[in-house]
Amino acid sequence: MSSELSETEKRKLIRERRQKKFSNGGASARLNRITGQAENSQLDTESPLDSKSSRETTPTVTKVDSNTEEMDELLENIATSPSNKVEKSQKKKEQATSPQETIDPELEIFKQLAENQQNDVSTPDLFSMLRSMKDNMAKSAATDTNPPLEPVDQQLLDYNNYLINNLKVWSIIFKWCFFLIPYLFALTRSEPISFLPEQFSNPSNFFMIFLSFEIVATSIYFQKLQNIEKSNKINGFQSNNKIVNLVSLIPEGVLPVPDIKGKVIMALQYWDVFSMFLTDICFVLVMMGLFKLI
């Protein structure tokens, strides 16, 4: 029993000596001898046993600090009134939308070019010239775009077409029945009619009389046609003509002719009048042939 106690005491003494030796800085030297590390090496071979006493434990206060900051912000939000919150949000929005974002990049380039040419007196102001060109292009683009036409009521359009056709029929009946047929009948008779003036009975004056009558009758017809369209506020050619509808599909600027739709409408109106004149000439030729046979 005494031998065992002496053996344990011996081990205890050895352990205490070793700990004392390590506490005095011998752990690092022992580690160097075990690993074969040179004395002037830059590798860190310091034993954790030597630095254990010199290290100080820092309290972990980061989590506590963050929690206290969040509590402070929460209390500040509760204390502030809603009006102050709105003002703060508006200030943040104003700061977010800086004036640099609204500046046109093209104008910035023009300004830089103008600043580079300020020293040269012979050249004009490039910035003002380019800016005026840009404004003119914007104005021309705004004027070229035709506003879309309002849809026309179909019943009103049908009524307008009915009035126009009625006017055309009555004008033809008046010209043929009350002037052309009696005049051609009197002109083709071998015996002169006493109650007619000499100018009307002379065949050489036929073309002048016929042309004058056509001009007066066509002018009256065209004036009545314009009155009907103004009263109904409908342009028959613009709303009911297939050619005008096809021309309206052509965008502005494609053809070199400006306002091609308006010119087509005017040409169709002239053709309507001229076609009535051609119809009267054909009627005169037919009636003269019939009266010659009688």
Curated annotation (Swiss-Prot):
Domain of life where this protein originates: Eukaryota
GO terms, molecular function: membrane insertase activity; protein transmembrane transporter activity; protein-membrane adaptor activity
Cytoplasmic-facing ranges: 1-166, 226-272
Region (Disordered): 1-104
Alphabetical list of InterPro entries matching this protein: GET2 (IPR014802), Get2/sif1 (IPR028143)
Bias (Basic and acidic residues) ranges: 85-95
TM stretches of this protein: 167-187, 206-225, 273-293
Comp. bias regions, Basic residues: 12-21
PANTHER family, sorted: GOLGI TO ER TRAFFIC PROTEIN 2
Protein name: Golgi to ER traffic protein 2
The species this protein was found in: Vanderwaltozyma polyspora (strain ATCC 22028 / DSM 70294 / BCRC 21397 / CBS 2163 / NBRC 10782 / NRRL Y-8283 / UCD 57-17)
